[in-house]
C-alpha cells in the first residue's frame, strides 16, 4: 500500500507541475487555469488519501502548520524574506507540534514494503 500511495502522489505531482508550466506560459488562458486547479485538487486529494490510509490527521496537521507559519512574522506582523522570496522564521517562530496527528503504531505492523 505504501508504494502505491507514494506512486499516486508522484504521478499527481508531475501532472500538477506540467499544468503549472502550461498555465504560467499562458496565464490568461481560462482552460489552462482550470486544468491547473484540477491537477492541484487531484494532488491534494491523493495526499489526503495517503493520510487516511495511514491514519494520519492531515486536517489537524495543516492547521498546526498554518499556525506555525504565521508565527514566522516579525514584531510588526510582516514576513521576513530571503533574497529569493522565501519567508524566513521570525523572532516569534514556534515549530508545529505534530505528535498529536500521528497515532502510535508498532513498526512491525507494516512489512518492509510498507504493506
Language-model segments: which ranges?
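Flexible "arm" and connector segments at domain edges
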Residues: 1-40, 44-115
Amino acid at each position: 500500500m505504501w508504494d502505491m500511495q507514494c506512486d499516486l502522489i508522484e504521478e499527481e505531482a508531475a501532472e500538477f507541475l506540467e499544468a503549472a508550466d502550461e498555465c504560467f506560459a499562458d496565464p490568461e488562458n481560462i482552460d489552462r487555469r482550470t486544468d491547473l486547479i484540477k491537477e492541484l485538487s487531484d494532488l491534494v486529494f491523493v495526499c489526503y488519501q495517503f493520510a487516511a490510509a495511514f491514519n494520519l490527521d492531515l486536517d489537524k496537521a495543516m492547521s498546526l502548520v498554518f499556525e506555525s507559519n504565521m508565527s514566522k512574522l516579525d514584531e510588526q506582523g510582516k514576513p521576513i524574506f530571503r533574497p529569493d522570496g522565501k519567508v524566513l522564521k521570525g523572532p516569534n517562530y514556534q515549530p508545529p507540534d505534530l505528535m498529536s496527528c500521528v497515532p502510535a503504531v508498532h513498526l512491525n505492523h507494516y512489512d518492509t514494503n510498507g504493506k
